[in-house]
Amino acid sequence: MNKTHLTQTKFADLPLEKSLISGLTSQGYEYCTPIQALSLPITLTGKDIAGQAQTGTGKTLAFLPAVFHHLLTNAQPENRRKNQPRAIILAPTRELAIQIHKDAMVLASMSNLRLGLAYGGEKVEIQRTKLEKGVDILIGTTGRTIDFVKQGVIDMGSIQSVVLDEADRMFDLGFIKDIRYLFRRMPEAKSRLNMLFSATLSHKVQELAFEHMNDPESIQIEPEVMTSVNITEELFYPSNQDKILLLLSLIEEDWPDKAIVFANTKHTCEKVWGYLAGDGLRTGLLTGDVPQNKRLKILQQFTDGEIDILVATDVAARGLHIPKVSHVFNFDLPDDCEDYVHRIGRTGRAGEKGLAISFACEKYVFNLPAIEEYIKHPIPCSEYDKNAMLDSLPVMKVTKYKAHPNSRKDNYHRTHKR
């Protein structure tokens, strides 16, 4: 745990339940990030918020302590039934829901509040069995949650707190009708603690907050600083045919402890993964086509250090919270400016330093002006020497969706041109 703190506000100085402070302290959390320092004093009084903050700013620990504190300091509704959770946290992707659940487990163990998960891609009976025993806090995606509501497995009639995480992404993925479906089945907004977090507080996000929340207070974390000061950005202009060789050369030069390579399409991700894995690098592939059980296994291997490099699409990687990612490579410049910020936000977290390297190739260089306008600064450009790059491409692996935890860096030998 890196002890670097971004504010002077301590969790222990906030009016949190002592058990929650103990849980946070046990995980090394002492000081608040800006989003936590601004939001918790508001939500701990029971007031709603709509918060704008980028990925990697500590949003999860801005809302989890507030939810737990609210349930611990307020009596549960009279005549509450077993199938009625007291709080619901909704995320746009199953990976983010799983990560939030993982972060919540420590607080749950210190407070005796029961957690439940609801997301697609896993056998429904496993989740149903857990929910039928009764949970206090349900964490999930909208689709599977609605399925359980329609089946009577859960009922929204006793909800006392609601969190919408990455609300802008929910709009992008077309989930807002689902969100409204669930809101209509909850008690009125005035009887709940409501929290919304989004990378942007666009008009449509603010409209959602106005419609389903109780006069939320808007908070923004330095919106003019779109990228973290902890991230060093670097830009190369490779030709299309040089991209793979340049990527391999940069990886060999730096030997990242933990890196994520982003590409714009599933096909490109598979190709990049094939060359990296074929070169003996411990590499995992994360796209929407990878079966859920394999995705979870690959993510765990990456988190545990059994895999050094993750090749991913934006949809598959959005919302992931993986500590100590040292490098992010934009193999393709994204078409969406916000995706650039989300991608490089995988590194430089919690005070750690990170490096974000982007390739402006012939196909995607036209995305660069809009990205630089959005982040309000030019990305520093570096040149590469073709004569210093690797001689040739490795044989590309064709077996898909498999990580390679058994190969080792010290077995990797390549020849440079000199």
Curated annotation (Swiss-Prot):
GO cellular component term, pick one: cytosol
Gene3D superfamilies reported for this sequence: P-loop containing nucleotide triphosphate hydrolases
Disulfide bridge partners, by residue number: none
Gene Ontology process terms (BP): RNA catabolic process
Enzyme class: hydrolase
Helicase C-terminal domain: residues covered: 243-390
Placement of sequence motif DEAD box: 165-168
Species whose genome carries this gene: Psychromonas ingrahamii (strain DSM 17664 / CCUG 51855 / 37)
Keywords carried by this UniProt record: ATP-binding, Cytoplasm, Helicase, Hydrolase, Nucleotide-binding, RNA-binding
GO molecular function ontology, one term from the record: RNA helicase activity
SUPFAM superfamilies: P-loop containing nucleoside triphosphate hydrolases
Pfam families in alphabetical order: DEAD, Helicase_C
Protein name: ATP-dependent RNA helicase RhlB
Stated family: Belongs to the DEAD box helicase family. RhlB subfamily.
Subcellular location: Cytoplasm
Segment forming the signal sequence: none
Enzyme Commission identifier(s): 3.6.4.13
